């Protein structure tokens, strides 16, 4: 599975390397937002050789919690908007919250495919990169699925890695949940369930026949680009 990188200002920063013993270490990292980094965190990121940050959050999320500026590291915004407003969310019951999480994953296929195409094309340049959203679980989770799928990682290992976000999110977010006295109906927003990402997978299958076809046809990421991505991020024996 992807390996946790411990920092003071993040709780879900992971190295994609090592999964299935196939992917190179220290090249691709996934994370929650980088707005709370301390100086020691920045030193550690520089020591990892990070040269690029890709921010998948909405414009509003970026404006309210800007990533810390790190000299020598390029920050690229590829905004994926949320599937709801806070007013809409407040008016929902718990079932409505669950449904909107599925809708958010569906919209990754139906609405945000151009952003995902740009994201994959950026990775054709294999410089050490962190990509992230707010909690590093939904938008980042699906972006990770696309990478791992192209690299030939099994769906079983992809799903295990996706669900691992809960191990890192639960201690931090449950503490915040209690301190802030947040309505219990919002608890699903704090974690991942297979049903969320499966919604995106199933919509891709319905519309394009498979995730593979979605990547090739809708994201225009054909075999030549796939081969380049595999060359960039797989260990040489693969």
Predicted regions and their residues:
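Ser/Thr-glycine-rich phosphate-binding loops at phosphate-binding pockets of nucleotides
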Residues: 135, 139-140
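Cys-dependent protein tyrosine phosphatase-like superfamily
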Residues: 1-130, 143-238
